[in-house]
Amino acid sequence: VNPRQRLRIALAKGRLYQPAVACFGRAGVRLDPDPGRRLLIPSSDPAIDFLTVKPADVAVYVESGAADLGVTGTDILRESEADVLEPLELGFGACRLVAASPAEDPWPERPGGQTARVATKYPRLAWEHFARAGRPVEIITVNGSVEVAPLLGLAHWIVDLVDTGNTLKANGLVERETILTVGAVLIANRASQKLKLDQHLALMRRLEAVAAPQGGGPSPSNPGTTAPVRP
């Protein structure tokens, strides 16, 4: 296959990886089950290769052109503000980004006008949410175990992803506000989509046929990020 016609797709390691592999499999693009130590993973389609990267790096690879396409969550995408196209919701990875606090904690104000400390992996989204509500907060960026931050005195509130809510309850936290509905989306490099439009559209049609629409796709706050699929 002519290298100019090949598609390189970045997949996020972690919670979205297996659902993404399954989604591509249903679309007839199966990853090599035993790639060994190869960084580029071949697939059943000779014109498509995959690479696996950290979730935060998917949009970086796609925006830079190191990958033509990628699969990522709208939480990471909105946090990064990457300049990429979002042509398709993929119908998996549904959850929500929420603000939460201890059940006994006053909400939405702190006693005596105290500035609330908020622990999160999403500092930009958290700050914007509270700024829109006119609530000054101090953002504390952490990379893991966000739910224990109030228990340990690191923060008063948290902003984190929630699926069932069981982890919040186990740590004595109550979901207060939904900030963003999250789901997996296909993202595309702008230049690549122009140069390889036919390949992009062919793959998108295959994925669209097996993807179930859900919330978490392109948002009104990000106009112009959706690439229409040509009929």
Question: Where do the PLM segments sit?
Answer:
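Domain-level signature for soluble enzymes in the chorismate/prephenate branch of the shikimate pathway
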Residues: 1-231
